[in-house]
Amino acid sequence: MKCSLLLVVFAAMVALFAAGTNAAMNQRKMLEVIGGLKKEK
């Protein structure tokens, strides 16, 4: 029981970390796209 609980907590932490890094990458891509649009104008 205790082992499975630790696995669930670990999996949740990994999922949160993956979501955080993914969001940061998406934000950087959006900033690059916005910067590119401003340069074109």
UniProtKB/Swiss-Prot annotation:
Chief location of this protein within or outside the cell: secreted
Domain of life: Eukaryota
Family: Belongs to the caterpillar 4 family.
Residues making up the signal peptide according to the UniProt record: 1-23
Record key words, sorted: Secreted, Signal, Toxin
Transmembrane segments: none
Protein name listed in UniProt: U-megalopygitoxin(4)-Mo5
One GO cellular component, as annotated: extracellular region
Tissue expression summary: Expressed by the venom apparatus.
Cellular localization per UniProt: Secreted
Molecular-function annotations in GO: toxin activity
Function text: Probable toxin.
